[in-house]
Amino acid sequence: MLKISIPTDIQILLIKALLKSGTHECGGVLMGEHIGTNHFRVSSLTVQKSGTIASFVRGITDAIKAIRLFHKSTNNNYQKFNYLGEWHSHPLFSVQPSSKDHHTMRELVSDPKVGANFVVLLIFHLKNNHLEGSAHTYLPDGSC
């Protein structure tokens, strides 16, 4: 099992993004640091424009640019710093992935262009202005 740590500064960014998008979904890309056996810390994320009440579409061009900038800022140390996956909000719904979420993440992890050993999906919403979320891991063999 993977452990994903989300530092306070990243949590604050997430809360601000969720407050700004209101009842519309928002999301982006997660980048992080390998800090121990099966343990990763989110060290950077993108916040892309909000979507609709029930969906969010990630802009691929902005995502690739953010990942490249992240790699450059970490001296391309792919062993320690890398793309972790995606995050988005479910402001009006459960923080559990929809069937569309599962499908999208399985496509990502099995895409040879992505080249990931795993991808993580974090889903958040605000409950009484506090961050509530879930984490899901997807592997290239199709398992979660």
Show which residues each predicted segment covers.
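Conserved beta-strand-loop surface patch within small alpha/beta domains used
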Residues: M1-Y83, P91-C144
